[in-house]
Amino acid sequence: MTLTGTAVADNMKIDGDRLWDSLMEMAKIGPGVAGGNNRQTLTDADAEGRALFRMWCEEAGMNMALDRMGNMFMRHEGEEPDLDPVYIGSHLDTQPTGGKYDGVLGVLSGLEVIRSIRDMGIRTRRPIVVANWTNEEGTRFAPAMLASGVFAGIHDEDYANSREDAEGRTFGAELDRIGWRGDEEPGRRPIHAMFEYHIEQGPILEAEGKQVGIVTHGQGLWWLQVTLLGKDAHTGSTPMEMRMNAGLGMARITEAVHRIAMEHQPDAVGAVGQANVYPNSRNVIPGRAVFTIDFRSPDLDKLTSMRTKLEAEATEIAKDLG
């Protein structure tokens, strides 16, 4: 990207204190447990966080565009406005027990880039757009990366708008409720390059004493929701050999998920993240179990192999338990 102005590249620095203060101010919205955040997508807290981000961007001379999925695009004009922009961004929504930096750092660092180059009197040849993607986490409305998926042509708008949360509220209705649906058709935006600054979400950098790492590949992801149907029965009066215990089936499949991921190393991972048994009574054998499986690998062949093997093992487990 060509730069013009009074600063030279060797002297270009952001204001780290200002970025930190912005992160801490955003973290006041939707406080969570242990100093983290609960600012799930399309909640009132999400709307408040969006409004604060917009205010900061407009104070920095940026203009907002909003598409029909609620994706926010804050534009800093370049010297040649007809050139395709460079995008910087991530997401402001969090997990229910999320941290202060996951996603938020990628959005607010983009804002800090704009603030800093303005402070230094620098003009870029290309426009810069700081993006906030809606529902990247997917914790409230599955799947993750829903609105960016519509932008990329992976999902259509009807599919996204019909996604439901645990209370039966739809993505579309909640987006309208908080007032952050725009008019722009998703995906109708030229992008010269996209940069996302993100926390590691893992222990490797800290364990190796490193400050920063460069992403070398993305994780392929397979999500599955499983329902096992057994038979409710009294725990005290039903003989062991006559039980159809859906909870036991869930436990065995959970163990299989871990073992299969370990068999596909390096880089493959797997876990059961959500789990519920019904009727969820201490003296009733579960007649139904509902749980989610998360398999990931940068290698498509490994990802496919893990899924195929688990499906075969889960079928045998279900047969064995009746």
List each language-model region with its residue ranges:
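Buried hydrophobic packing segments
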Residues: 53, 107-117, 250-253, 257
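Beta-strand segments within the central parallel beta-sheet cores of soluble alpha/beta enzyme folds
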Residues: 67-69, 87, 123-134, 268-274
